[in-house]
């Protein structure tokens, strides 16, 4: 089942204006997941991704229902990690996939109005994503992070490259916290994706607010990518926000 056609442009506009993206599990460190999500969204998180690899299907589906309900309350976007079938079942706004060759299947499963995101790890992968039917990319990991064991850090160079060449909105990801977020923004990112910086904070709300303050302090004007985002999306033939 495709998402309602009228919702596609609205969701893409919300994606384009998003600044802070949180990935989280179904049971984050045995915390109350709904309380954590509500705190994070109150602090300024715009997008929630459910990324759960360990639990059974029934429990993941229950978590997805919670994520979707909370996101609807806060007018946030809800994305599912690596599972187009779950995204369709729980009526998520979209799916995030980790490999370029998974994009076409995700798009076919969810239809043209769903949001499809893709992980990229190099300048070459950023360029390759320009030709794929995705709505956003994540670029990283900028710094090593235990959430991606074995994945080497790529540094800030791919961020700067994406700011100049990516035709889709992009999020810097990997080891970002309030102490280094300004570096990522100064490299060209206008969107940040985090896990531990908000999930593991004593107050997710305060952590999200701190990240947004760091962003505001470093973002001294439009990104060089803004002009690229105003051009037609190659696969859709319309502007990414429309």
Question: Which residue stretches match the model-derived regions?
Answer:
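Glycine-rich beta-strand-to-loop/alpha-helix junction loops that act as flexible
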Residues: 139, 172-176, 194-198
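Conserved N-terminal beta1-alpha1 strand-loop-helix module at the mouth
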Residues: 1-96, 103, 108-135, 151-154, ...
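C-terminal binding/interaction regions
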Residues: 187, 191-194
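Non-cysteine beta-strand/loop elements that form the S-adenosyl-L-methionine
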Residues: 98, 135-142, 195
């Amino acid at each position: 089942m495709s998402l309602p056609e009228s919702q596609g442009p609205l969701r893409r506009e919300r994606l384009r204006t998003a600044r802070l993206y949180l990935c989280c599990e179904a049971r984050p460190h045995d915390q109350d997941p709904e309380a954590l999500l509500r705190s994070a969204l109150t602090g300024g998180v715009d997008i929630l991704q459910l990324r759960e690899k360990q639990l059974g299907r029934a429990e993941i589906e229950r978590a997805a229902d919670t994520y979707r309900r909370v996101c609807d309350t806060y007018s946030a976007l809800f994305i599912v990690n690596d599972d187009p079938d779950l995204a369709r079942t729980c009526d998520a706004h979209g799916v995030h996939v980790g490999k370029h060759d998974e994009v076409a299947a995700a798009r076919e499963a969810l239809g043209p109005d769903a949001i499809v995101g893709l992980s990229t790890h190099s300048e070459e992968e950023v360029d390759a994503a320009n030709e794929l039917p995705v709505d956003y990319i994540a670029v990283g990991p900028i710094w090593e992070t235990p959430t991606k064991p074995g994945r080497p850090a790529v540094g800030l160079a791919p961020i700067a490259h994406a700011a100049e060449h990516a035709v889709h909105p992009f999020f810097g990801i990997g080891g970002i916290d309030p102490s280094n977020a300004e570096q990522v923004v100064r490299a060209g990112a206008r969107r940040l994706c985090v896990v531990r910086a908000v999930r593991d904070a004593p107050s997710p709300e305060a952590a999200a607010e701190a990240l947004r303050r760091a962003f505001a302090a470093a973002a001294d004007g439009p990104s060089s990518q803004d002009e690229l985002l105003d051009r037609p999306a190659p696969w859709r033939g319309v502007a990414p926000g429309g």
